[in-house]
Amino acid sequence: MTVIDILTRVDSICKKYDKYDVDKQREANISGDDAFARLYGAFETQIETALEKAELVTKEKNRAAAVAMNAEIRRTKARLSEEVPKLQRLAVKRVKGLTTEELAARNDLVLALPARIEAIPDGTAGGPKSTSAWTPSSTTSRPDIKFDSDGRFDDDYFQESNESSQFRQEYEMRKIKQEQGLDMISEGLDALKNMASDMNEELDRQVPLMDEIDTKVDRATSDLKNTNVRLKDTVNQLRSSRNFCIDIVLLCIVLGIAAYLYNVLK
């Protein structure tokens, strides 16, 4: 079993028996009902994440990726700075189970937060503020930045480096690709616009035809209605004529029977 396996096993055992630790259970209960503890824990997590990203930026060789990470760090710093007043309001609220000394310590923690947030490296020209004075020896930590004896940049600083050249080329390539994509989108929109215009013109041409069809349908409906009325009248006339003929035939039969009976009885 390796050392890592042993440490993992010990950690799992410690977590298993944490529920029997009275102090930890008390802290967990306090933080569960304490908005300050939750928010301050979120601050700590975001600050640690930002510091880790800042450390990754120093090791990042891709200039574009480093710029993107620095921008994300600056957004995180701005968001944290906006949330500091809320944390200050929560720090002065009394919480059950906390002493006066602990409340004072919370206020001190909140007062130290702006400096901690500002100290996070974000790739800006000024960088994090420092209380120490600038000396010529302070430039040794950044050998790629050189200062004159008067504190001004020398000519070597403004020369284009390989990283800046690569970043410029990558930026130009992405800009060209973006312009090509926008051109394709513009062409597609123009094609859709032309199709819509053609469809509109075709609909305009179809409107008179539809009106004419509606007129003809109305006329045919009226003619069919009149034809039905005339046909009904004709049928009624035929029925009346047929009934008259049947009545005459029946009358003749009745008269014949009467004449026969008269002759027989006579």
From Swiss-Prot:
One cellular component term from this protein's GO annotations in UniProt: cytosol
Residues modified as Phosphoserine: S12
A Pfam family annotated for this UniProt entry: SNARE
Region of interest (Disordered), ranges: 122-146
Entry's transmembrane regions: 244-264
Cytoplasmic side: 1-243
Keywords: Coiled coil, Membrane, Phosphoprotein, Protein transport, Transmembrane, Transmembrane helix, Transport
Entry's localization field: Membrane
Tissue: Expressed in root, leaf, stem, flower and silique.
Keyword field contains Transmembrane helix: yes
Residues covered by the t-SNARE coiled-coil homology domain: 172-234
Ranges in coiled-coil conformation: 44-87
SUPFAM superfamilies: SNARE fusion complex
Superkingdom, taxonomy of origin: Eukaryota
A GO molecular function held by the record: SNAP receptor activity
Function recorded in the entry: Vesicle trafficking protein that functions in the secretory pathway.
Protein name: Syntaxin-71
Species name: Arabidopsis thaliana
Gene assigned in the entry: SYP71
